[in-house]
């Protein structure tokens, strides 16, 4: 049960601990910078900071990690909108419409909407975390391998919605992504598949592929055209004030997408990237003008960021109440709590209730700082789009190389990134979208591993596909999502 007296005590504790507030602010700012840099993720930032929290006061150390987590999820949207370079996997969905708005001279609108949506989604997720954590976490525990497979299948069906003008080309790109996702260690047997003898391919190099498809390919195209890296580079960011009319228009979208993000975040293995794409798809499905998506729809930007940041609180739910991390970041945070002598789980709310509620208050503070620091830093980070193309193009390529190399100190990863960049360049020329490839790389391993696990648990029978209500509902929704664009196209042709 929610205890208001502990929340009040948490406020008092935090107000009397300026050091914790300072470290939380530092964490948010560091997270924004890390998220904005291609190849660097919130997971990496949290992992690097983890050893330093051991000698720190518990609240300060844990809030600094929370700040990096929250800021990292949001930071990827900045370069995704301005340069179509997703700083994080979750920002790949934001880039679809965010960059189109930049090309239309509406970069300021897109950035302010992304910042406010990130703040709102994160705040709503923390409120849910405070009030409903025991109930929601126990419900999320019902997701077995079959439900997780169905969720991944639903995620893959979203390819139909993000394929742009050609569904066939989008599906081809998605199949290509699924094939790439099979490279590496078999999820059940542990033996290498399609690695060609390269040890580096034991795990699919997802981040290098994403950087190559989205960033390097754009730089290659710019060099061919011998012009500025983007037409958007000639456009000032403009006002960062979000108009009241726009706020009213996206309010329901933010609320719905935040809820989806919280729900998806609670499911182990489903992170902010999945939440962003699912929120994008659902917003498009509910929209009266779905044809505007992919062409600069502000609701799309709001939905992706609200969903991704709503996932943060959702991922913390099972970690804090059941000791089950929702994603890689919360797994590291679980380690941080253990280092501080606290064992996440049901007993944590009774043994360390005051600490838990102090963290809740600190998380709210982190999101307020994200809103303030996010808006203040946009102009600084956004100045990159004013740099001439003959300077910016080599800078972007250098950033791609450095960011990729920093992942594992591996030149092999750099080679993978450059190959993906060349492939992405030819995909652009042929009209094949890159987003389905990224989505398939995210969802493919999750779908395969959970399907095989569910098949093993059912003794080789496929009855788990239709005997479990949640699994059946998600698979039905996936079929509906996949068929909707086809039905719409047929109806459009009939009208003509």
Question: For each predicted feature, which ranges?
Answer:
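Membrane-embedded alpha-helical modules
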Residues: 112-227, 339-493
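Short helix-coil transition sites and intra-membrane helix breaks within transmembrane domains
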Residues: 33-43, 81-91, 124-128, 264-274, ...
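Helix-loop-helix hairpins and the membrane-proximal interhelical loops
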Residues: 1-61, 134, 141, 192-297, ...
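Membrane-embedded alpha-helical segments of transport systems
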Residues: 70-75, 116-128, 180, 302-316, ...
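Re-entrant/interfacial helical elements at transmembrane boundaries that shape
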Residues: 42-52, 65, 80-100, 131, ...
